[in-house]
Regions:
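Ribokinase/PfkB-type carbohydrate-kinase core domain
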Residues: 1, 22, 60-75, 79-154
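Glycine-rich phosphate/adenosyl-contacting loop at the front of the ribokinase-like
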Residues: 1-47
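A glycine-rich beta-to-alpha transition motif near the start of alpha/beta enzyme domains, typified by
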Residues: 6, 44-70
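Charged, low-complexity surface patches
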Residues: 26, 52, 130-131
Length: 154
């Protein structure tokens, strides 16, 4: 299961995790899709928004190590993070803080960010910002001949 959480809950979880052995990995629907494409030999790019914190830098570094062209905007909010809890029987639940990623607005997307790509895959969480209905973004996709796909699992 997954539960969206606020900053206060995130801080409590981080305090709890600071006393445990943890593992950090990149993820998210779009992040996992881009990682898979890179492993298959494609040359994907990633547009998103991160905080100027250790998680944002970790995410940027991971994408760059995989040769993914990063087009990451930064903001003062913490980076989005999904804190994962796994029970002894393998059941998983996520406490998801969207953070900086949730502030990405269509107005921040420039036509040159789409140049050279054939597909645009939008993370489901960004649908809450109506980023998929923005005429500016749509015109950028049309101008650059980009097919627009979005994750509706949110």
């Amino acid at each position: 299961s997954m539960q969206l959480i606020g900053k206060d809950t995130l801080l409590k979880i981080q305090d709890l995790f600071s006393r445990m052995k943890t593992h950090c990995a990149t993820g998210g629907s779009a992040g996992n899709t881009i990682s898979a494409l890179a492993h298959l030999g494609a040359a994907p790019g990633f547009i998103g928004k991160i905080g100027t914190d250790e998680y944002g830098m970790f995410f940027r570094k991971h994408l760059q190590q995989m040769k993914v062209e990063t087009r990451l905007l930064e903001c003062a909010l913490p980076s989005g993070i999904a804190s994962t809890f796994i029970s002894p029987d393998g059941e998983r639940t996520f406490g998801t803080y969207l953070g900086a990623a949730s502030t990405l607005q269509a107005e921040e997307l420039m036509p040159e960010m789409f140049a050279g790509y054939s597909y645009l895959y939008v993370e489901g969480y960004l649908l809450q910002n109506n980023i998929h209905h923005n005429s500016r973004q749509t015109s950028q996709c049309v101008y650059n001949k980009v097919i627009y796909i979005y994750d509706t699992s949110f």
